From Swiss-Prot:
This is Beta-1,3-galactosyltransferase 7. Gene3D superfamilies: 3.90.550.50. It is a single-pass type II membrane protein. PANTHER family: BETA-1,3-GALACTOSYLTRANSFERASE 7, BETA-1,3-N-ACETYLGLUCOSAMINYLTRANSFERASE. The lineage of its organism: Eukaryota, Viridiplantae, Streptophyta, Embryophyta, Tracheophyta. Pfam families: DUF4094, Galactosyl_T.
């Protein structure tokens, strides 16, 4: 019993000590327990600072990126503006070059010899071998010398034999033409190599050359084996001068000749190598003026001059000319006085008061044996020498 009491007393003595010990241990434990929390708080604060700094850096990057983009856009605008300025400079340069070229052309002759305004320019198609044909024309319906000059000055009618040059520079053929021109002063020299199969090219070059030299209301092409009444031609054209685009002549539409050989010894004169472009065999050409003589107004001559490099040439010159006007607003005028026959046809018409513009024979595509017969045709079919001078233009 005594033993039990003693044991209880010892226990009571140790209670305060144990309490203090537990309190101390609790304090120590509590202090250690909050240290990590303090570290966590510091980490949270540090993390917050880092996030804030990252946000600032990010904002700075975004700002810099935006600034860079704005700078890039500004740069693009500046470069575009500079490019536009360059384009304007280029346009200005082209304009300057054009002006310089125009000025040079004026210096070369346009200023001192500007295009003369005339009523009509007639080009008589001729060849090196056709001296006698030219003389037969000069002796009949074409005025010579002072009369030819006066016709141009008073009536605005220009008449020239048109011819190119030979394949060999300064050949005997070219020198012969030089000599003939020095005598008669009635040639228009073309930058063209003469050849029968190059008539389409020659026609283009004639119109281009004539347009560059004369500002005419009408341009006419005629062959050197055709008889022409100049007064009737001028008065006929004058009736159409108010129309902007006219194509005047004897309109026809012949068959497209696909075969090149008649037999083993003869070829077809008017064979068309590009016959397939006109459709099936047996088709006809589109309507066009026969090539012996035709007239076109100023706008059409200018059109040929401007587009000369890209105008297609067919085998036949008159077909080529007609093809150049396909698709254009052109008035085709079929005037049968442009294709009268030789006597007695032209005489009958003259007696009836319907003087012919031109006379020739279809079988020869001109006046047959024109060198010998031009005078005969002129005596019978001529309108009279004074007709052209009395024509009101």
């Amino acid at each position: 019993m005594k033993h039990k009491v003693s044991k209880r007393v010892i226990s009571l003595k140790w209670v305060p000590f144990l309490c203090i010990s537990f309190f101390a241990l609790g304090a120590i434990f509590t202090s250690r327990s909050w240290e990590p929390s303090s570290d966590s708080g510091s980490q949270l604060i540090s993390q917050h600072h880092r996030d804030h700094e990252l946000q600032i850096v990010s904002d700075d990057c975004a700002h810099n990126k935006k600034a860079t983009q704005e700078k890039d856009v500004t740069g693009e605008v500046l470069r575009t503006h500079e490019a536009i300025q360059d384009d304007r400079s280029l346009d200005k340069s082209v304009s300057t070059l054009s002006s310089t070229r125009s000025s040079q052309e004026m210096v070369d002759g346009s200023e001192t010899n500007p295009r003369k305004k005339v009523f009509m320019v007639m080009g008589i198609n001729t060849a090196f071998s056709s001296r006698k044909r030219r003389d037969s024309v000069r002796e009949t319906w074409m005025p010579q010398g002072e009369k030819l000059e006066r016709l141009e000055q008073e009536k605005g009618i220009v008449i020239k034999f048109m011819i190119g040059h030979s394949a060999t520079s300064n050949s005997i053929l070219d020198r012969a033409i030089d000599s003939e021109d020095a005598q008669h002063k009635d040639f228009l020299r073309l930058e063209h190599v003469e050849g029968y199969h190059e008539l389409s090219a020659k026609t283009k070059i004639f119109f281009s050359t004539a347009v560059a030299k004369w500002d005419a209301e009408f341009y006419i092409k005629v062959d050197d084996d055709v008889h022409v009444n100049l007064g009737m031609l001028a008065s006929t054209l004058a009736r159409h001068r108010s129309k902007p685009r006219v194509y005047i002549g004897c309109m026809k539409s012949g068959p497209v000749l696909a075969q090149n050989l008649l037999n083993c010894f003869r070829t077809v004169k008017y064979h068309e190598p590009e016959y397939w472009k006109f459709g099936e065999d047996g088709n006809k050409y589109f309507r066009h003026a026969t090539g012996q003589i035709y007239a076109i107004s100023k706008d059409l001559a200018n059109y040929i001059s401007i587009n000369q490099p890209i105008l297609h040439k067919y085998a036949n010159e008159d077909v080529s000319l007609g093809s150049w006007f396909i698709g254009l607003e052109v008035e085709h005028i079929d005037d049968r006085n442009f294709c009268c026959g030789t006597p007695p046809d032209c005489r009958w018409k003259a007696e009836a008061g319907d003087v012919c513009v031109a006379s020739f024979e279809w079988s020869c595509s001109g006046i047959c044996k024109s060198v010998e017969r031009m005078k005969i045709v002129h005596e019978v079919c001529s309108e009279g020498e004074g007709a052209v001078w009395n024509t009101l233009l």
